[in-house]
């Protein structure tokens, strides 16, 4: 996390160093009159200016893989790129600005505007391209921000024979393209949620000659307050599935949706309470392929005895990373996560149910102890971890006390000390280094 903040700050400083303030309008987008896009994209900018006929403000997508206001993509596979521009214009003084999508194509040696569509919107949330009807030509999916980020509308456009046709327009919170029913054709997976109304759902839509029709839908956890980007992957059984990390009032959960017997199902949710509790955990930890086996694992919390001495009776947890086959969560590995210092440690399976943890946030220490559940007492220390600032004099102090450096980054040094019992079990510095991971 610390590395991300530094990188982001450097990027912002670099942007301001490379460009003058006069290129920004009041809404921080680029006002082009005439266009100032340079290099290979300059002829496209000329075509946009000619088509627009006046001042316009380029609109950059706030999310997704495509972050440019002018996106080039070969949607029909003929080896020639098409360009898709997104901008706003005021039709006359005092009027609200309208948003445009402008398709610019190369005709012989020149670029020219082929088609435009106008919409009342404030910005672009994301852009995607996906062949939704199996004809070999990708549709253009545009998530429009209607009133800021509070309301979004997904528009699906087809561009064929020089014409841009809008196929659908509907509300969404998140969307992604995927082939969940394995029929060989991509569908649109749309999430809609309303924290205020507690009405959350997911639907799968198919593009036909008559437009976009709903194939399947199901309910999501009704108490969800925010939804992360859905991840298209597979169950451990190989069936296509969508993994959705969500924030609830009491933490985070993951819901996994897939098509079963011609229905979109969400087996991890309790249908009676309309809540998902099986994957409940602290916020900030999302599903991922934690062990690089090609299958997404879901983090599930497990209580662990705490040896922390504090006025607050803080509960401590280990994290079980579980694969899911559509019926059962199966633990693949267990880790002690230290989000404050930015690392996690994969625990030996031998320690399952036999350890306690000491958490000393002030001194950046985590220690694992052997624990007797019957007597509820801790025995000897197995492994101790400490995080020290890179140039801190305490680094040498800990080295003198028998600690060994595991790794370091641009900010901190991470050290460990292995107890006699752990050493007798075959745990050594190399073992610790192998199982110690910095969080991204």
What positions do the PLM features span?
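Generic N-terminal leader/processing signal
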Residues: 1-2, 104
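Sec-dependent N-terminal signal peptides of Gram-positive bacterial secreted proteins and lipoproteins
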Residues: 2-26
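Beta-propeller-forming repeat regions
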Residues: 20-359, 368-370, 392-415, 431-440
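A short, aromatic/hydrophobic, helix- or strand-capping loop or linear motif
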Residues: 362
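A short acidic-to-branched-hydrophobic micro-motif
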Residues: 374-392
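Short, exposed beta-strand-loop hairpins at the edges of beta-sheets
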Residues: 422-426
């Amino acid at each position: 996390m610390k590395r991300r903040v530094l990188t982001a700050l450097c990027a912002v400083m670099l942007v301001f160093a490379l460009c003058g303030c006069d290129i920004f309008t009041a809404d921080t987008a680029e006002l082009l009159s005439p266009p100032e896009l340079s290099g290979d994209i300059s002829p496209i900018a000329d075509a946009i200016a000619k088509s627009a006929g006046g001042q316009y403000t380029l609109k950059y997508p706030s999310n997704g893989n495509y972050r440019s206001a002018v996106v080039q993509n070969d949607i029909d596979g003929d080896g020639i790129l098409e360009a898709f521009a997104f901008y706003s214009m005021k039709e006359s003084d005092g009027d609200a600005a309208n948003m445009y999508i402008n398709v610019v194509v190369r005709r012989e040696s020149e670029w020219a505007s082929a088609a435009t569509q106008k919409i009342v919107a404030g910005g672009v949330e994301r852009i995607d391209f996906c062949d939704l009807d199996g004809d070999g030509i990708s549709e253009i999916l545009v998530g429009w921000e209607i009133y800021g980020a509070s309301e979004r509308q997904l528009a699906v456009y087809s561009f064929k024979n020089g014409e841009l046709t809008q196929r659908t327009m509907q509300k969404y919170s998140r969307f992604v393209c995927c082939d969940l029913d394995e029929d060989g054709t991509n569908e649109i997976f749309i999430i809609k949620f309303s924290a205020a109304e507690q009405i959350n759902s997911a639907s799968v839509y198919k593009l036909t000659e008559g437009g976009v029709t709903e194939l399947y839908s199901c309910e999501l956890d009704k108490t969800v307050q925010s939804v992360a980007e859905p991840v298209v992957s597979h169950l451990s059984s190989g069936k296509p599935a969508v993994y959705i990390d969500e924030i609830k009032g009491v933490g985070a959960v993951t819901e996994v949706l897939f098509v079963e017997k011609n229905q979109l199902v969400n087996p991890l949710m309790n249908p009676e309470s309309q809540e998902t509790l099986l994957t409940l955990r602290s916020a900030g930890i999302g599903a991922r392929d934690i062990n690089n086996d090609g299958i997404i694992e879901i983090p599930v919390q497990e209580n662990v005895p705490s040896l922390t001495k504090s006025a607050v009776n803080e509960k401590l947890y280990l994290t079980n990373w579980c694969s899911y086959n559509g019926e059962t969560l199966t633990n693949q590995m267990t880790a002690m996560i230290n989000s404050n210092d930015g690392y996690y440690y994969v625990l030996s399976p031998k320690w399952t149910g036999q350890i306690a943890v000491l958490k000393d946030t002030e001194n950046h220490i985590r220690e694992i102890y052997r624990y007797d559940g019957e007597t509820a007492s801790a025995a000897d220390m197995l492994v101790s971890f400490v995080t020290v600032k890179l140039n801190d004099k305490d680094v040498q102090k800990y080295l003198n006390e028998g600690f060994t450096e595991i790794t370091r980054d641009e900010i901190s040094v991470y050290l460990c000390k292995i107890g006699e019992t752990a050493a007798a079990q075959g745990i050594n510095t190399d073992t610790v280094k192998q199982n110690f991971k910095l969080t991204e």
